[in-house]
Design a protein with these regions (language model features):
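Gram-negative and organellar
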Residues: 1-240
Length: 240
């Protein structure tokens, strides 16, 4: 539901991975005066993306909040905090995490699909529950590693990076034509040194008032203990 100042986001999903599980998400964005907006989001059993191992066998209960300040129309400041409880898809508790992210950016234009550059810094703290994994989660652990919760929970890190984004569409805004979008960036963290992210995709309508998005992403950074990860993403959104 979208009102004059407030936008609500309600979502439910069913995931097929190591185990099948449902998820719920509820969030709100509230627009204040002078280009300032506040937002929050609560999640139950949603996919955990803080590491590739969590993405494969984990999920999270999370709460995030923050604000976005559109300073001049092209320059902006965004701050977000996240509190996360990590669980295996079998239901076993794995640990928890807290992150703070600060973005300072500049848009090159005022179009709905904005192109811009941003400086981003993140501080992330993680704590693993100190106990062995159950048999199903242990099946994901290589034979030379200990089968405990440390396998899933990433290291705490501090990271700063510069990123160029282009062609990004606002989720709630319909677009009539197909467009390319992507992100290129470099970063450095205190745990894994220099890293990068590269993402390229296309999105546009298929049947009319809808949007299909296809993209590929490859990254290597402190967010995943310096490990390289690749993702192929397909999303479909129907407007009404």
């Amino acid at each position: 539901r979208i009102s004059t100042r407030s936008t609500w986001d309600v979502a439910a999903a069913y995931h097929q991975a190591l185990e099948n599980y449902p998820s719920l998400r509820l969030g709100q964005n509230y627009q204040l005066e002078s280009g300032l907006s506040l937002h929050w989001q609560a999640e139950h059993q949603t996919p955990a993306t803080d590491s590739s191992t969590l993405l494969a066998g984990g999920m999270q209960n999370a709460f995030s909040s923050g604000f976005n300040w559109n300073i001049t129309g092209r320059e902006y400041l965004a701050v977000q905090t996240d509190l996360k409880q990590f669980k295996g898809q079998t239901g076993q508790n794995l640990g928890n995490g807290q992150t703070v992210t600060v973005d300072i950016g500049h848009y090159f234009d005022h179009q709905p699909s904005k192109n811009g550059i941003k400086l981003s810094t993140r501080i992330a703290q993680y704590q693993a529950d100190d106990h062995p994994l159950d048999s199903k989660l242990s099946s994901l652990v290589p034979t030379h590693q200990a089968a405990n919760t440390d396998f899933f929970i990433p290291q705490s890190y501090k990271q700063i990076g510069v990123y160029w984004q282009f062609g990004e569409a606002q989720p709630e805004v319909y677009q009539r034509s197909w467009r390319s979008f992507g992100e290129l960036g470099v970063d450095v963290s205190d745990t894994s040194g220099f890293g990068y992210i590269g993402r390229l995709g296309f999105h546009g309508p298929v049947l009319g008032y809808d949007r299909l998005s296809l993209s590929m992403e490859q990254s290597q950074s402190g967010r995943d203990n310096g490990n390289q990860s690749k993702q192929f993403l397909l999303n479909y959104r129907l407007f009404y």
